[in-house]
Amino acid sequence: MSNNFKDDFEKNRQSIDTNSHQDHTEDVEKDQSELEHQDTIENTEQQFPPRNAQRRKRRRDLATNHNKQVHNESQTSEDNVQNEAGTIDDRQVESSHSTESQEPSHQDSTPQHEEEYYNKNAFAMDKSHPEPIEDNDKHDTIKNAENNTEHSTVSDKSEAEQSQQPKPYFTTGANQSETSKNEHDNDSVKQDQDEPKEHHNGKKAAAIGAGTAGVAGAAGAMAASKAKKHSNDAQNKSNSGKANNSTEDKASQDKSKDHHNGKKGAAIGAGTAGLAGGAASKSASAASKPHASNNASQNHDEHDNHDRDKERKKGGMAKVLLPLIAAVLIIGALAIFGGMALNNHNNGTKENKIANTNKNNADESKDKDTSKDASKDKSKSTDSDKSKEDQDKATKDESDNDQNNANQANNQAQNNQNQQQANQNQQQQQQRQGGGQRHTVNGQENLYRIAIQYYGSGSPENVEKIRRANGLSGNNIRNGQQIVIP
């Protein structure tokens, strides 16, 4: 057996029956606690532990052994159920033979042979297709529940269950077309409802449908023969053919629904065949009225289920549409508020631009006014400077004129004085010429030497005399100049 568990999470999902596996569970828990203690000791001794690889392997081994034990117990329970179902079918076949022997000789024996044929085929299918070993806990749980249900049905409540089960028979005459039509509608509605749900359960229901088809065909043939005992063989054969066709349609529909779990329903089909055969043999005489009522109630229930599915679909659509509508409304509100915010931002930007423009214009006008005032002040200061300069110039001119006038007066006085001096010098010269001597200057002579020569002393008084007599202002004389000596 191969281990199909992928991780600890899948392994821990196993369902444990406390009534039958309590001792094994305690042993497993004890082993797990010992293994955990041993793993902790090994991990403390190791420097780099291998991430609990040995622990996971031991847990997988324990889970594999546990699954083997569960599978063996379920297999034995299935064998017991099959044996009990076989004994019940044998009893029912014997009772059907006895009742048919008491009936008139012209009664058709075809349904009995068909029932035996389908029972044999069902058990042959069960033996030829053994149940595969599966490690999935979900499948084991379903199989145990089915086995328990079949066992309790066969042992304790076979009679009550047979009376309560719907009778899969097919009426003859006018009711046959209505019954087949109702079954076809019911099958189509059931197929539409179950197709999206059971896509992954393929081959399991195919075998169940095949077994149910055989049982339904046999039971329908027996019920038809007992409901109308004086019908001929041809009519019975045609009825059984129609029943087989309808059951084959139903089997093909069930086969298209359940696709993945194939060979598991053979034993269930065999048990269903035995129960359906016994129920058909006991209640064929009064089967038409309950079957009609069952069809009506079944149709009503299926219509109710169909309406519920429609309401559920509508509710699902509403649940899907409401969040979408809410999301659209929220997005629209956000878009509106975002547009308003952008519009306000743009308006604020425009207002700021206008305010800045006005402010700039005001600043420019203020600057212009300031420049005008400055130019005015400058022109005023220039004018005042010019006027002050003109005034200063006029004052200076006036002072110059006054000074010139004074200079002219001084010059005139000086000229007068010079004129008088010249006149005096001229008079003195004339006096000297009349009573003094003349000396011609030669070489290096000067007034000091000339005074020594004529007066015997070069005193300043003598020199001054010579100057006065000649009208000299300094000591400068030239060669060849004639000097009067007084």
UniProtKB/Swiss-Prot annotation:
List the Pfam families hit by this protein, alphabetically: LysM
Primary localization:
membrane
Q: Which residues form the LysM domain?
A: 437-485
The Basic and acidic residues compositionally biased stretches are 1-40, 103-118, 126-143, 180-199, 247-259, 299-314, 361-398
Q: Which SMART domains match?
A: LysM
Q: Establish whether keyword Transmembrane helix is in the entry.
A: yes
Can you tell me where the transmembrane regions are?
205-225, 320-340
Cytoplasmic membrane side:
226-319
* Entry function: Promotes binding of soluble elastin peptides and tropoelastin to S.aureus cells although it is not able to promote bacterial adherence to immobilized elastin and, therefore, is not a microbial surface component recognizing adhesive matrix molecule (MSCRAMM). May be involved in sensing the environment or in nutrient transport, since its loss caused a growth defect.
Put simply, this protein is called: Elastin-binding protein EbpS
Which species expresses this protein natively? Answer: Staphylococcus aureus (strain NCTC 8325 / PS 47)
Upper classification of the organism: Bacteria, Bacillati, Bacillota, Bacilli, Bacillales
Gene name for this UniProt entry: ebpS
